[in-house]
Curated annotation (Swiss-Prot):
One Pfam assignment: IPPT
Sequence positions that bind ATP: G10, P11, T12, A13, V14, G15, K16, T17
Domain of life: Bacteria
GO biological process terms, semicolon-separated: tRNA modification
EC number: 2.5.1.75
Protein name: tRNA dimethylallyltransferase
Amino acid sequence: MKQDLFILAGPTAVGKTDISIKLAQKLNGEIISADSMQIYKHMDIGSAKITEAEKEGIPHHLIDFVSPFDEFSVAEFKEKSKNAIKDIASRGKLPMIVGGTGFYIDSLIFNYDFANTYKDEEYREHLKNLASEHGKEYVHELLKDIDEVSYKKLYPNDLKRVIRALEVFKLTGKTISEFNKEQDIFDIPYNVYYFVLNMDRSKLYERINKRVDIMMEKGLIEEVKSLQNMGCTPDMQSMKGIGYKEILYYLDGKLSLDEAVELIKKGSRHYAKRQLTWFRKDNRVNWIDKDQYKDDTEVCNAIEEKFLNLKNNL
């Protein structure tokens, strides 16, 4: 029998945290975070990490456990999440994936396993060198003639995935989407119940701007200063997150404070747009428009009802 897996996703600042706590209480669940910034220690304000008080006693997994000096891969997330899902289920609880990092979520609900197959390290290095010499756009353009779907879907900055698409074509003669279809990507050990929160874009952008102002008031500059004093630099994976890189540039005198704050807001709004685009590509998603409900309690009731109906109709 397949394990039930509940997913609550949505763009940054849409209000996932509060709703996830209410749902975990209703559904007897524990939360596995799918957030690529909340994994890091010492990075609480800029990642909007949930506090102990906000957890209201609900156990959380995969939060605050990676050093900002370390890299953390999607493969590692998948492995740790699978272990957490087993652990939660063994105690009779519902595993709940909550977050906005789409490729973390996809690693669990698609049957992607490239870790030990179809690799060509030499070709990867060659493409990385091309990107260093000629720019990421140059490597992205290589996709145009061989895999137009990936060319249109992937941004030049998403170099890892661009290289992966080129690598799969070189090794198999197939586009990555064709290759994935043949791998039976929906053959996973879970019954997936996937909900994505959304709201009117102007309201969401207002919430994002307000959230950034609150982060500044809470001491984001001091948090980044502390990380800088620890030895963190802009080239580290952890420091490339929105909010951290801009404040680092401010501290280094490359931006004024107003410029840094405006860039954080702008970057967060663009990120929210990309997140929504990502979630829209999965037809298993049940969209929840928060504007249709009076408050979070009503939102939770609607999600709970939909979840139970889906379970009963399996």
